[in-house]
Amino acid sequence: TNCLLGGIIKVIIEDSLIFIRDANEKLFVFDLNGKFRNMIGVMGNGPLEYTSLSDFYVNCQKKFVCILDRIKGKIYRYTFDGQYIEEFDCDRSVFNNVIDIHYVGENKLLLNMNNHIGTLYNYALVNESSYKLEQFLHPYPVVSRERISNGMLPTVVYGNGNIFYTVLLSDTIYTIQDGESRPIYLYEGGLKHINYEALQQETPYQSIFEAEMKLIKKGYSGGLLQLFQLKDHLYFEICQGEECWNIFWNLKEQTGFKYNSCLPGIRIFPGKVQTVYENYIVRS
């Protein structure tokens, strides 16, 4: 069988366009009807070609898309139609450890970082004009000996002028105001919140997830997982013991509701959430 796409890695919907990165290191653009429009960039070793599609992001305000080539240490910038604009050198000490790049307005990028011995922080705030580090955010309380991250799950949302993001092993949702990280919501699900003191009880750990599993058995929450912003709601997931909750929080009314998607024999929301569009959840 012939299939245009390989396995889907990352999806972003902006400006009525669907940007899809697949497992073959290609970046496709479709319209909202699913019609193919164009590719972004060309993979190769020649001029203006990227060697690796390590990640991508979309600047929804200035209407361009950028590809990170970790091998070359480059950021390639294109129009939504796939026309090359320019390229930038990026700070390898930062971008070599990034797993997910998010545009968060005001000429800023928020980078979700791997958790391992070479990276001590969950996030890096980067200037989009220079691709230089401005500051690291949220030191990891446990550093894994392997490359581990929650970056394969979408954990940062930006829309309607709002920035929300989650931190590994935390029940808190944060925002960025005046260049500073600030807590804005705390999910109370009846379990204890993981903190630094709790994590130090049984050190050392091989990985941060080993620490998580040990603390869950002691009655601690495993922290928030993926996070999205619908038209009026924040949508996020959290696993607490054997229960996995899908939670919808109305930003205007400051009320919410939740579903347990791990009831015996029932999976209410099957598949991985790739992105959202208005009030629709896109799963694969």
Per-segment meaning from a language model:
Residues 3, 41-48, 90-97, 140-144, ...:
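Short coil/turn segments at the loop-to-beta-strand junctions that recur within blades
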Residues 124-180:
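Loop-centered beta-sheet repeat module
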Residues 1-25:
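Beta-strand-rich domains and repeat architectures in extracellular enzymes and scaffolds
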Residues 184-216, 252-282:
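Conserved blade-ending motifs and adjacent loop-strand segments that build the rim/top face
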Residues 7-10, 51-56, 95-102, 146-154, ...:
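Repeated scaffold domains used in trafficking and secretory/extracellular systems
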Residues 2-7, 35-62, 69, 92:
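Blade-loop segments of beta-propeller domains
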Residues 16-22, 63-69, 107-117, 124, ...:
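Short beta-strand elements that form the blades of beta-propeller/WD-repeat-like
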Residues 50-53, 69-121, 135-145:
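Asp-box/WD-like beta-propeller blade repeats and closely related beta-sheet repeat scaffolds
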